[in-house]
Amino acid sequence: MSAYGAIPREPVDLQPSRIYALKKRSDGEQSHTHMVCVHLRKDDIPNALEEAMRTSYNETLIEGSTYPFRDPMDKDAFQSYFFGYDVVVGVLVNASGQQYQDGSEVSLAELLGQGASTASRHDLLGKAQWPQQLGGFYYVKPNYPGRSSHICNAGFIVPTSSRGLGLGGLLGRSYLIYGPAFGYLASVFNLVYLTNLASAKIWERLGFEVVGRVPKAGLLRVPGTDKEEYVDALVIYKEFAPH
């Protein structure tokens, strides 16, 4: 839900899945080699995956440093907020010995060991291991209604157990493909808190620009304490390349 209420939008066709190589861990322990970004809608998401997503999202809310919401969301609230439009989920897979170009289209069935299966995305993802294979996820929705609905907004989550592996950057790269594929011409992030350095660096690296700053936009938790402090937020924008 945006500040403008529910924004009507025609659903788009499900887009192809895309693959990205994970950076190699320095300790040599790596059970997954790639992340497959999969376009989904509410009915495509099996219960175990939804629960893993909601758990990760609520852990992020409890941290109190990146999203404005104070309290964890129950199932209905999470579905309403996250699944109203389009969702992209990063699925961790082991594709060692195979060569893929980052961002290329792939068969989800083959990467999940189902061969040339014609099963639905819901059924395929139901065979994966959650939360072990959850690399991250994000929603994409219109930021404004009507005459400005060509500009979208997205919200990204990387599970705490998967941070530091560069997954946020891979999700961001996929967003540059999926955003215009969903029919949007540009993206805006309304609240990138100054303390969220990882996010700001990702968007700068991907060619986004800071177009505004909101003073004292968030009353955020101070890490390692019970205190809170006001933090400014950046407004970050990018026009998508033509799809």
Language model features by range: what are they?
Residues S2-S80, P242-H243:
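A short, well-structured alpha-helix characteristic of acyl/acetyltransferase catalytic modules
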Residues G5-K23, N190-V192, E204-K227, V231-V235:
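Conserved catalytic-core motifs of GNAT/GCN5-like acyltransferases
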Residues S56-E59, Y178, I202, L206:
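Alpha-helical interaction/dimerization surfaces of two-component signaling modules
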Residues S65-R163, G172-R173, Y178, E239-A241:
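Acetyl-CoA-dependent GNAT
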Residues N153, A198, R205:
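Amphipathic alpha-helical recognition patches that constitute DNA-binding helices
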Residues G166:
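Glycine-rich phosphate-binding loop
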Residues L170-S187, E209:
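Conserved acyl-CoA
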Residues G179-L194, A198-K201:
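Conserved GNAT acetyl-CoA-binding A-motif
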